[in-house]
Amino acid sequence: MRTYTAYVEFDPETKLYVGVVPGIPGAHTQGVTLDELQKNLKEVLELCLEEYQGAKEDLPRFVGLQLIEIAV
């Protein structure tokens, strides 16, 4: 079993939680609740990784998130 990091935002326009798994092309989804989002992320991640079965080492490697401060 392997653990992946998901970036999650709440979209006030659609009232949905949106999640992206960095480094896995196509691994993004949405849900009405955080629980639904987690279920959907797990499902889409499994589907994406099935596509890369033999070439998982060729996938980009997620390094981390950075906070960027700017004056606005």
Can you say where each PLM-predicted feature lies in the sequence?
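Short, charged, surface-exposed hinge/linker loops at domain edges
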Residues: 1-5, 36-72
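Hydrophobic residues in beta-strands and at strand termini
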Residues: 21, 31, 70-72
